[in-house]
Regions:
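Short amphipathic alpha-helical segments, especially helix-boundary/capping motifs
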Residues: 1-5, 57-59, 78-81
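Non-catalytic C-terminal interaction segments of nucleic acid-processing enzymes
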Residues: 4-10, 32-33, 49, 111-169
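Active-site metal-binding core of divalent-cation-utilizing nuclease and nuclease-like domains
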Residues: 7-64, 163-168
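Residue-level "edge-of-site" marker
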Residues: 44, 98, 123
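A generic structural signal for ordered secondary structure
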Residues: 57-65, 91-93, 118
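Short beta-strand-loop-alpha-helix junction that forms the active-site gateway
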Residues: 62-63, 67-76
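Catalytic cores of nucleic-acid endonucleases
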Residues: 72-120
Length: 169
């Protein structure tokens, strides 16, 4: 049986979108299994550049941003995105194939900046470098928190609606 391999860049756009969608779904399921409450959509981050976070999640009182990099994505761009997200999130993680990230000349910069690096292995994920807590700005954080509240998710673990606090009737 003859097997041919195609570079991801050579795949049609709809195939690349499917690969990204499937990797994103794997990450969402993995995060849920680890106690995170991921936002179902990409999240807007108020930044002059790189405004859309691939996966954002709440764990306890902390906001987490995850930037997924496929084999055809630029690791340098991933570093720029992580820098942009750090104004609004407590923890920022790049998720990619281990070799691509660790062999990249930018690997030491991720480490120095305190960004986490996770390896994507099949349907699972493994932490290579744990992220350090960031100091988010209140205004940027508020923009992200509003997006979570629309889906009933709030940092701090209190997922109740205001209606739970008010007696009706």
């Amino acid at each position: 049986m003859l097997m041919t391999f195609t570079r991801i860049q050579n795949l049609p756009t709809n195939c690349r979108a499917h690969l990204y969608s499937s990797a994103r779904e794997n990450l969402l399921r993995f995060l849920e299994s680890k106690g995170f409450k991921p936002h179902p959509l990409e999240v807007f981050c108020p930044s002059p550049t790189h405004n859309w976070v691939d996966v954002a999640a709440v764990k306890g009182a902390d906001l987490w941003a995850f930037e997924y990099k496929s084999r055809s994505d630029s690791i340098r761009r991933g570093l720029e995105q992580c820098v942009s997200y750090s104004s609004a999130f407590d923890y920022v993680v790049i998720v990619a194939d281990r070799h691509r990230v660790t062999a990249s000349p930018y690997f030491s910069k991720f480490k120095r900046e305190g960004f986490g690096v996770w390896r994507h292995i099949g349907c699972g994920f493994q932490s290579i470098i744990p992220p350090k807590r960031r100091r988010s700005t209140p205004a940027a954080r508020a923009v992200v928190e509003r997006q979570f509240r629309r889906f009933g998710l709030t940092p701090g673990g209190d997922d109740r609606s205001i209606l739970d606090w008010v007696q009706v009737g």
